[in-house]
């Protein structure tokens, strides 16, 4: 069973949104984990109003994404108002980031993650066939 790790930095609205996203994943068969090293999907939800929250999220995601070569199957994503306002910057600062979802698109997070995982699986199958 795939595992999801969500870390929320920022306001109460971010907490509520993270809970909703977690419910979506659980309904689709994921298990929640509080350990990043067990997760198949790592999502950070951060507020752009609180600069300290933003910096913590960026720093932590940067560290985790560097581990991607050791855990290439993991999907890394940023959500929230920071993701919405700094989408292009995030992809530049964190080149291993797979997903950036703003506040108006929370309902599509699972769909995006599922698409990323399917594309990776297809690519692996293509590599095995060549």
Label for each model-derived stretch:
Residues 1-130:
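Proteins enriched for Cys/Gly/acidic motifs involved in redox and nucleic-acid/cofactor modification
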């Amino acid at each position: 069973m795939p595992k999801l790790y969500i870390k929320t930095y920022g306001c109460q609205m971010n907490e509520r949104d993270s809970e909703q996203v977690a419910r979506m994943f659980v309904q689709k068969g994921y298990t929640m984990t509080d350990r990043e090293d067990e997760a198949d999907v790592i999502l950070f939800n951060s507020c752009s109003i609180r600069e300290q929250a933003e910096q913590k999220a960026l720093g932590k995601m940067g560290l985790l994404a560097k581990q991607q070569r050791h855990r290439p199957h993991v999907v890394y994503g940023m959500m929230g108002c920071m993701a919405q306002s700094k989408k292009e910057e995030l992809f530049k600062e964190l080149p291993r980031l797979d997903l950036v979802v703003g506040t108006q698109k929370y309902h599509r997070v699972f769909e995006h993650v599922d698409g990323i995982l399917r594309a990776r699986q297809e690519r692996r199958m293509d590599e095995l066939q060549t």
